[in-house]
Amino acid sequence: DLGVVASIADKVAVMYSGEIIEYGTVEDIFYDSRHPYTWALLSSLPQLATTEKLYSIAGTPPSLYSEIKGDAFAPRNPSPMAVDFVEIPPKFPVSDTHWAKTWLLDNRAPKMSKPEGIQDLHAKMLKIYDQAGGANLG
């Protein structure tokens, strides 16, 4: 439950298919996430001030019993790159406290903006954070 995590944790590790795919402070993950799976998780958080249907991640998680080639999230990623299906991404540093395993952070990757919904969500969460005086979201 990301809401609980935000209210009690200082650091967050986002896991997918048994691997940590993004790591950082609460602020890094909630306001500047970089992995498409983290974006999908944040998009699926219920918003109290809306009646919109919750976002649902397409597809199913991979079996932990079969070998995964490339980025495990690639088949469910709405905008995967070819490299996602063949090579596991390394940890790419975002800052001294934040890293993510996504080819989007490779300097050879095409420059992509965060999905509009994530940009809006990051802005909303940052506003809540600022109103709370910089305290955790809880």
Which functions belong to the PLM regions below?
Residues 132-138:
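NTP-binding/hydrolysis catalytic cores, primarily Walker-type P-loop NTPases
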Residues 25-132:
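Short catalytic/signature loops enriched in Gly
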Residues 1:
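Aromatic-residue-lined binding/catalytic grooves and analogous aromatic/hydrophobic interfacial grooves
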Residues 15:
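Catalytic metal- and UDP-sugar-binding loop of GT-A-like glycosyltransferases, i.e.
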Residues 5-7:
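A short, surface-exposed alpha-helical micro-motif characterized by mixed small hydrophobic
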Residues 11, 23-24:
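Short, glycine/charged-rich "phosphate-handling" switch motifs in NTP-dependent
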